[in-house]
């Protein structure tokens, strides 16, 4: 059985999140939590929050055992971009793009 958790509009670019997401794909939940808690990146903290949410969904909603769960997939998609202007010299302006992302974590039972 599969369980998922979604974190929408996370204030980090999808490109930065994908580097962290690739590290935990296919690992057990305990290994993934250990790796994320010792990774010194903002994306690791946000992904750990989403992983814990998926774990809580598995325990409470699906009534699955935590010990047998594996991270089946982690998808990081681009969310909407907030655009801001920054004044520059001679009356011009540059665009500042504040990117967001949607994080989806899917957990599944370990096979075998």
UniProtKB/Swiss-Prot annotation:
One of its GO terms (biological process) is translation. The keyword Chloroplast does not apply. GO terms for cellular component: cytosolic large ribosomal subunit. InterPro entries: Ribosomal_uL22, Ribosomal_uL22_bac/chlpt-type, Ribosomal_uL22_bac/org-type, Ribosomal_uL22_CS, Ribosomal_uL22_sf. Keywords: Ribonucleoprotein, Ribosomal protein, RNA-binding, rRNA-binding. One of its GO terms (molecular function) is rRNA binding. It holds the Pfam family Ribosomal_L22. SUPFAM superfamilies: Ribosomal protein L22. The keyword Transport does not apply. Part of the 50S ribosomal subunit. This protein binds specifically to 23S rRNA; its binding is stimulated by other ribosomal proteins, e.g. L4, L17, and L20. It is important during the early stages of 50S assembly. It makes multiple contacts with different domains of the 23S rRNA in the assembled 50S subunit and ribosome. Belongs to the universal ribosomal protein uL22 family. This is Large ribosomal subunit protein uL22. The gene is rplV.
């Amino acid at each position: 059985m599969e369980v998922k958790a979604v974190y929408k509009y996370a204030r980090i670019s999808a490109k930065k999140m994908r580097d962290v997401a690739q590290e935990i794909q296919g690992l057990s939940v305990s290994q993934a939590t250990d790796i994320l808690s010792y990774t010194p990146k903002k994306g690791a903290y946000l992904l750990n929050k989403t992983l814990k949410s998926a774990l809580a969904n598995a325990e409470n909603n699906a009534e699955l055992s935590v010990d047998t769960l594996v991270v089946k997939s982690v998808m990081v998609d681009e969310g909407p971009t907030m655009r801001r202007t920054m004044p520059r010299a001679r009356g011009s302006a540059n665009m500042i793009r504040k990117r967001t992302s949607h994080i989806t974590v899917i957990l599944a039972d370990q096979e075998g």
